[in-house]
Design a protein with these regions (language model features):
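Acidic/proline-rich low-complexity IDRs
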Residues: 6, 16-20, 33, 37, ...
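Extracellular repeat turn/loop positions enriched in glycine and acidic/polar residues, especially those
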Residues: 121, 130, 149, 168, ...
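Short, surface-exposed interaction patches in beta-rich subdomains
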Residues: 158-160, 164-169, 173-268
């Protein structure tokens, strides 16, 4: 695909995304205003409630699907779920904890939040998170298989350890401050992505419209397969102008560029 074709493709994608967000936002705001006027919701009546104090059975997997609620993951002595919203429900399916909010949380006028506490010594088999308009913050995540599907809100993860990692970012910013991430498949949307962590195994990153900053350990650990787009690609202070292989490390990262810049730096 030529540079001109790439430009047309990404401009069309960006225009489509902006138009879609504008239409959806207008519809949601309009419906929300009607419902709030009809039900006259009083946010002060909502108090934090523990929807499950403890889970007697072993929880190996957690599946979270939130349309508009914020998600906060914290360290705790046991698996615990809290929410300030009546729209948030949970159930246990075998060894899987499932958490979901209803679509009405988009229009009920509340700032809905879910807090999930996970012991620091617990490594989950699977963690699936699908989040829409809300933000996500996590102190620590330790999991074999991670699947993140993010929407308009920002995401910050202080420490991430994962063996198999699939992340789709949306319009919000995405930040990982530390950790060890293996076999990463990352698709970046519109927002800015910053990852400060080791990335191990065979990984693939598609920047699309958003920008990417990687802060990695020693450069000798990595091989980069660069498919340059319209944005700049800078690896260890050297700008890459063409598609090429950079480095000869054991860990491979395929970088597919788009409109946004890609900047890779290393610990000195």
């Amino acid at each position: 695909m030529s540079s001109t074709q790439k430009l047309i493709k990404y401009v069309a994608v960006l225009f489509g995304l902006l138009l879609s967000f504008s239409i959806i936002f207008s519809i949601v705001e309009g419906i929300g205003g009607i419902f709030r006027a009809l039900i006259n919701t009083d946010n002060s009546t909502f108090e934090t409630r523990v929807i499950s104090e403890d889970f007697n059975d072993t929880i190996n997997d957690i599946d979270i699907d939130l349309s508009s609620s914020n998600l906060i993951i914290k360290k705790g002595d046991k698996v615990l779920v809290e929410s300030n919203s009546k729209s948030v429900k949970y159930k246990i399916d075998g060894t899987t904890l499932k958490i979901k909010d209803s679509k009405s949380s988009l229009i009920n006028g509340t700032d809905s939040s879910v807090i999930v506490y996970i012991p620091d010594d617990v490594k989950l088999d699977k963690l699936n998170i699908d989040i829409g308009a809300g933000y996500l913050t996590a102190e620590s995540v330790n999991v074999k298989k991670l699947d993140l599907n993010l929407g308009a809100g920002s995401t910050t993860i202080d420490n991430l350890i994962s063996d198999d990692t699939d992340i789709d970012t949306g319009a919000g910013s995405f930040t990982i401050n530390s950790g060890s991430i293996s076999n990463l498949d990352l698709d970046i949307g519109v927002g800015r992505t910053v990852i400060t962590a080791g990335i191990n195994g065979n990984s693939s990153i598609d920047t699309g419209i958003g920008s990417l900053t990687l802060n990695l350990p020693n450069s000798g650990f990595y091989t980069f397969d660069v498919d340059k787009g319209l944005g700049r690609v800078i690896i260890n202070d050297d700008e890459i102008f063409n598609d090429k292989i950079v480095g000869d490390g054991i860990n491979t990262i395929k970088l597919s560029g788009g409109i946004g810049d890609i900047i890779v730096s290393f610990d000195k």
